[in-house]
């Protein structure tokens, strides 16, 4: 259990995973995250090394500013990522919400509830390479079972909205994942 914690880093601010074994029963609340690559990262391996299962994780009451990505879920080696709940999360971010599983049936039970992600200016020129790295859609998800978005809002002004190919690209997922996208 982690609570009432400010974090700042140039890498992922809160990373769950990377290594061997199983990580389970993580509880984190009332976090303030500043200036990192990802606000929250769930990662089963790093560049093909390691294999960690991630299960039963809950984040609540999180604020993040200046992060590239509010949430990244990356499964690349067949390990399981299950039963992750993120609720009451507010982020000012430059990149997309990215949740991608390389293998079908390894990532399941992902819930984002009462989350607001506001897109802010990036310090990088929007070249094709930068667009591919940061994501071409505001929300990207693939190969996730039981993906649930409840009151998820992604806010973007008209000028920034032109820098994206679209609001959402969700492929090979099951669940309830409608969300509100707004131009402000």
Write out the residue ranges for each language-model feature:
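Extracellular/periplasmic carbohydrate-active domains that bind, remodel
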Residues: 1-184
């Amino acid at each position: 259990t982690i609570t009432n914690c400010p974090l700042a880093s140039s890498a992922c601010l809160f990373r769950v995973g990377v290594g061997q074994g199983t990580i389970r029963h993580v509880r984190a609340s009332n976090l303030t995250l500043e200036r990192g690559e990802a606000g929250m990262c769930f990662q089963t391996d790093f560049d093909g090394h390691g294999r960690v299962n991630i299960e039963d994780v809950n984040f609540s009451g999180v604020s993040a500013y200046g992060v590239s990505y509010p949430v990244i879920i990356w499964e690349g080696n067949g390990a399981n990522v299950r039963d992750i709940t993120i609720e009451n999360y507010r982020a000012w971010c430059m990149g997309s919400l990215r949740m991608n599983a390389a293998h079908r049936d390894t990532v399941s039970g992902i819930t984002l509830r009462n989350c607001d992600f506001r897109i802010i200016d990036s310090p990088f020129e929007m070249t094709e390479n930068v667009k591919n790295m940061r994501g071409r859609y505001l929300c990207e998800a693939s190969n996730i079972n039981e993906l649930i978005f409840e009151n998820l809002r992604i806010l973007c002004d008209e000028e920034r909205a032109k820098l994206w190919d679209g609001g959402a690209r969700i492929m090979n997922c099951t669940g309830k994942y409608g969300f509100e996208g707004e131009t402000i």
